[in-house]
């Protein structure tokens, strides 16, 4: 597995582990393939998290996502996760030009909203 990863991402700590519920995959790799874990970046791309956000924030995008048919077979799961991530990338993260000014404006707005304190009542 490590040789395969190195063919595409030879530099250590650059390749991301990605997939659906990828935390479980990471635990398996930690227990059984520590050299693979050592080569991977520490961050994960969990397609399930993106799916959950789409379900809550972009319901139509969630409802139109490609249907899975893999039956929880390893290769089918991998290919369907790639397909699902590509779908969400195109629908939720379009490649429209985003200016730094717009990004700064949104960042200011979000910061101005503040972070609610735990136990604080909503008005």
Tell where the protein language model's regions lie, with residue ranges.
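Metal-dependent phosphoesterase core characteristic of DEDDh/y 3'-5' exonuclease domains
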Residues: 1-123
């Amino acid at each position: 597995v490590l040789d395969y990863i190195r063919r595409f991402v030879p530099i250590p700590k650059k390749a991301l582990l990605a997939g659906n519920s990828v935390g479980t995959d990471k635990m398996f790799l930690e227990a059984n393939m520590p050299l693979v874990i050592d080569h991977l970046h520490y961050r994960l791309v969990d397609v399930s998290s993106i799916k959950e956000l789409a379900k809550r924030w972009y319901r139509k995008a969630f409802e139109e996502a490609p249907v899975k048919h893999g039956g929880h077979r390893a290769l089918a799961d991998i290919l369907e996760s790639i397909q699902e991530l590509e779908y969400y990338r195109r629908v939720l993260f379009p490649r429209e030009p985003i200016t730094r000014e717009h990004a700064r404006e949104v960042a200011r707005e979000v910061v101005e909203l503040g972070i609610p304190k735990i136990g604080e009542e909503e008005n």
